From Swiss-Prot:
<dbReference type="InterPro" id="IPR014623">
    <property type="entry name" value="Tfc7/tau55"/>
</dbReference>
<dbReference type="GO" id="GO:0000127">
    <property type="term" value="C:transcription factor TFIIIC complex"/>
</dbReference>
<keyword id="KW-0804">Transcription</keyword>
<dbReference type="InterPro" id="IPR051710">
    <property type="entry name" value="Phosphatase_SH3-domain"/>
</dbReference>
<dbReference type="GO" id="GO:0016791">
    <property type="term" value="F:phosphatase activity"/>
</dbReference>
<feature type="compositionally biased region" description="Basic and acidic residues">
    <location>
        <begin position="405"/>
        <end position="417"/>
    </location>
</feature>
<dbReference type="GO" id="GO:0042791">
    <property type="term" value="P:5S class rRNA transcription by RNA polymerase III"/>
</dbReference>
<protein>
    <recommendedName>
        <fullName>Transcription factor tau 55 kDa subunit</fullName>
    </recommendedName>
</protein>
<feature type="region of interest" description="Disordered">
    <location>
        <begin position="362"/>
        <end position="417"/>
    </location>
</feature>
<dbReference type="GO" id="GO:0003677">
    <property type="term" value="F:DNA binding"/>
</dbReference>
<keyword id="KW-0238">DNA-binding</keyword>
<dbReference type="Pfam" id="PF10419">
    <property type="entry name" value="TFIIIC_sub6"/>
</dbReference>
<keyword id="KW-0597">Phosphoprotein</keyword>
<comment type="function">
    <text>TFIIIC mediates tRNA and 5S RNA gene activation by binding to intragenic promoter elements. Upstream of the transcription start site, TFIIIC assembles the initiation complex TFIIIB-TFIIIC-tDNA, which is sufficient for RNA polymerase III recruitment and function. Part of the tauA domain of TFIIIC that binds boxA DNA promoter sites of tRNA and similar genes.</text>
</comment>
<dbReference type="Pfam" id="PF00300">
    <property type="entry name" value="His_Phos_1"/>
</dbReference>
<feature type="modified residue" description="Phosphoserine">
    <location>
        <position position="365"/>
    </location>
</feature>
<keyword id="KW-0805">Transcription regulation</keyword>
């Protein structure tokens, strides 16, 4: 097997980003090795739950040895029950002229005391950044050199691992992705629209191999025929860019190489504050439109009853006429007409909770959950809201999203029960034939 899926995440919201302290000293005693703010800790838990909800979950995590990255990966490791390895090769980028010093992260002996039972000692860093600092070009060359060496080691030492997670910093997250995609420098655009890799706090990128490194199953001997593809010949595609949809406060502290200041530094914070002061406030809308979120079950027809109908991740869902007896749906390039029916049985919608697809010994748990489609915001549809059904989050659970302030001053975790909605309506779709 080969590594065919790579997640790359930036650490959570740092304590020195708070508008008004407290600003705790680094526990490691290393300059700028600041811990996360309470808000950043909650972001890390939200990221952990999001990864838990995915079918394709990381089987191992590699983290920059700076404290904020380990705080970010800790709830992920506990929730997904995966090992965490220290990797200096994906560490922070510091310019040679940085003052007063260029931070060097702590090692396993110190960090294991702060994160007992989380960090594995069974890994030596693939590369070590120049402790005298790096120019932008030197930093980018570090990551171009890092990838083939790192992936070769992972596949050799952990041959059954196909999906991994890297937890790093803003500049490193961008440079890792751009070098993996084969770009010449980290400042280039991803497309003609000028899009770039986004790097908000606790944002998540996903890279997948364009061509699987295996061919077909040999039915004669019931074995899979593998064709190994060297790393230099593998083609990667970015399938998730700076995703923050799972964060209750959305994207925060995005950074890119057009910024002059070091990512997350005091200079970076001051520049953001000045920009915020000089920018014009966005006027509030005069009218407030009331909306109602409606959860319904949508049945999609299949041409073959023996096969499961699947929708491509990139497919666009459009709908109209939910207030009518025959609403129209467009899924990808197909058009459907719907008819309302009463749902037989029980389906539940969990608006904010993660759907659990936990792996045990490399396999998904036998519990399968019904797929529910949020058909949009509309009036006139019947939806039952049962306030008696609630769930209890565990220690690494999510906070109630309504209690999160963007100022994040004096943030404290406040775990709330969450409502679950019972779905009673369904729409059965039928293909609309072209005229």
């Amino acid at each position: 097997m080969v590594v065919n899926t790579i997640y790359i995440a930036r650490h959570g919201y740092r304590s020195n980003w708070l508008p008004e302290g407290p600003y705790p000293d680094p526990l490691t005693g290393i300059d700028s090795d600041v811990p996360l703010a309470e808000h950043g800790v909650q972001q890390a838990k939200e990221l952990a739950h999001y990864l838990l909800s995915l079918d394709n979950q990381p089987e191992a995590a590699f983290a920059s040895p700076f404290y904020r990255c380990l705080e970010t990966v800790q709830p992920i490791a506990k929730l997904l029950e995966i090992p965490v390895y220290l990797e200096r090769g994906i560490g922070e980028w510091y310019r040679p002229d940085r003052k007063p010093v260029i931070p060097v992260p702590a090692g396993y002996e110190i960090l294991s005391k702060f994160f007992p039972g989380v960090i594995s000692q069974e890994w030596d860093s693939t590369l070590t950044p120049n402790e005298k600092g790096e120019t932008e070009q030197e930093m980018y060359m570090r990551f171009k050199k890092f990838w083939p060496l790192f992936i070769e080691r992972v596949e050799k030492e952990y041959p059954n691992v196909e999906c991994i997670l890297l937890v790093t910093h803003a500049a490193s997250k961008i440079a890792l992705g751009m070098s993996l995609l084969g770009y010449d420098n980290p400042r280039m655009s991803l497309n003609e629209n000028g899009d770039k890799i986004r790097s908000g706090s606790c944002s998540l990128d996903k890279y997948e191999i364009l061509k699987k490194s295996y061919d077909t199953i040999d039915e004669t001997d019931d074995q899979t025929s593998f064709t190994y593809i060297p790393f230099s010949d593998r083609k990667w595609v970015l399938t998730m860019n700076g995703n923050t949809e799972f964060l209750s406060s959305g994207e925060e502290m995005n950074w890119n190489f057009d910024c002059v200041a070091e990512a997350g530094s005091d200079a970076d914070i001051k520049k953001r504050q000045m920009t915020k002061k000089t920018s014009s406030p966005i006027p509030e809308a005069d009218d407030q439109t009331e909306v109602e979120t409606v959860y319904i079950s949508v049945d999609i027809p299949s041409g073959n009853y023996k096969e499961r109908t699947e929708i491509a991740k990139s497919a666009i869902l459009q709908y109209s006429g939910l207030e009518t007896d025959a609403p129209l749906f467009r899924i990808g390039n197909r058009l459907y007409e719907g008819s309302w029916e009463r749902l037989v049985g029980t389906e539940l919608a969990f608006p904010n909770a993660a759907h659990v697809h936990k792996k045990t010994a490399g396999l998904l748990s036998p519990t399968e959950e019904n797929e529910t489609t949020n058909a949009g915001q509309s009036k006139g549809s019947s939806t039952a809201n049962d306030p008696n059904i609630q769930i209890q989050e565990e220690d690494v659970g999510l906070p109630d999203s309504t209690n999160t302030s963007r100022d994040h001053t004096g943030d404290k975790e406040e775990v709330q029960s969450e409502k679950i909605y019972r779905i009673k309506e369904r729409i059965v779709l039928s293909n609309v034939r072209p005229m």
